[in-house]
Amino acid sequence: VNSFYEVMKNYLKVYGEDEAGLSNLITFLNREGDMRFAQDVCEEWQARVKQSFYKNKVDGMTDEKGKIKWPSVFSLYGTTLLGMLITDSFVFSFQIGDGDISAVTKDAVEPLVEPEKFLGTETHSLSKPDAWRKAVASVRRREMESEEPYMYILSTDGFANSYTSDEEYQKTCKDYL
């Protein structure tokens, strides 16, 4: 999450938070959200993992020449990622791996991104090479006229999987309103 936050904070600095800057950011995220933005998030995550590893070295993570086996180190820190930026004019949703990002109203629970579904426990992870290639993202304009209550929910796949049916999961999401 910190990697997503740090990258998004930098994008907001570059583009600016005024109307023109956010308009340009929407355009960029629509075109590059699941590629360039995803690459930046993965690079930030790897830099943080390396920094943590240098502070807290783990035995067995070097080869016979003493070179660090980064894929093995990354797998120690492997995780999926859900992130969201909410502005007055748009919502940007970003995901690598499993989980759910949805908009919830009293009438519906609508996914904002459609990640690849897996059977069993297999999933995409930041620890895998080229994890950014598996990122999914969406930009949705916000409708400001609606007076109806709504919320966004970001959850691990364990939340949805803990219900006996999708209907039960959706009912619980609506109950949070």
Where are the predicted features?
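PP2C/PPM-type serine/threonine phosphatase catalytic domain
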Residues: V1-L177
